[in-house]
Amino acid sequence: MAIDVKAIEEHIRGILIALGDNPEREGLKNTPKRVAKMYEEVFKGMCYSNDEIAEMFNVTFEDDLCINDNENDMVFMKEIEIFSHCEHHLALMYNMKVAIAYIPKKKIIGLSKIARIADMVGRRLQLQERIGSDIAEILQKVTDSEDVAVIIEGEHGCMTTRGIKKPGTKTITTTLRGKFNTDPIVSNKLMMLYTK
């Protein structure tokens, strides 16, 4: 699905009029075009399904990997910074830090691909909970591992700049699949690494 930049421009112009401003005045003349271009960039992830993102980043390494299926060795990355926009208010979700872990089976994925998956999933109208489950689903598809964990901490503009107006409020969500959800030793190891 392609983003309709022209339609966004027209609607932003309409919003400016509805707000009581003049879209032809100097400071706003190019605003609809700039906003449409920005939306095309920040919502790029909406152009792709989880399957398409998995295919896009499906570069794995298998030849040099010696894995014992009984092991609980994990790959763990944290402090992956992303942003997103909440689907309820279109408000920015910011200061988002993502931690991702998986237990390799037969394939490992390049570290930069993990960060790129998180970034692409964030570039949608989202819920923080869904960002975690989307990342987990994609990583499961790419690595063929059921054992995936995603922890996200972030701030939400809909909490900090409107309504209750509580700046600094952080939301933490967890998505735990496979052993991360069923094996206390694995989940404890995850939390130890996360809080380190």
From Swiss-Prot:
GO terms for molecular function: GTP binding; GTP cyclohydrolase I activity; zinc ion binding. Signal peptide: none annotated. Pathway: Cofactor biosynthesis; 7,8-dihydroneopterin triphosphate biosynthesis; 7,8-dihydroneopterin triphosphate from GTP: step 1/1. GO terms for biological process: one-carbon metabolic process; tetrahydrobiopterin biosynthetic process; tetrahydrofolate biosynthetic process. Zn(2+) binds at C86, H89, C158. It catalyses: GTP + H2O = 7,8-dihydroneopterin 3'-triphosphate + formate + H(+). Its EC number is 3.5.4.16. It is an enzyme of class 3 (hydrolase). One of its GO terms (cellular component) is cytoplasm. It holds the Pfam family GTP_cyclohydroI. SUPFAM superfamilies: Tetrahydrobiopterin biosynthesis enzymes-like (SSF55620). Keywords: GTP-binding, Hydrolase, Metal-binding, Nucleotide-binding, One-carbon metabolism, Zinc. Toroid-shaped homodecamer, composed of two pentamers of five dimers. HAMAP family: FolE. Belongs to the GTP cyclohydrolase I family. This is GTP cyclohydrolase 1. It comes from Clostridium botulinum (strain Langeland / NCTC 10281 / Type F). The gene is folE.
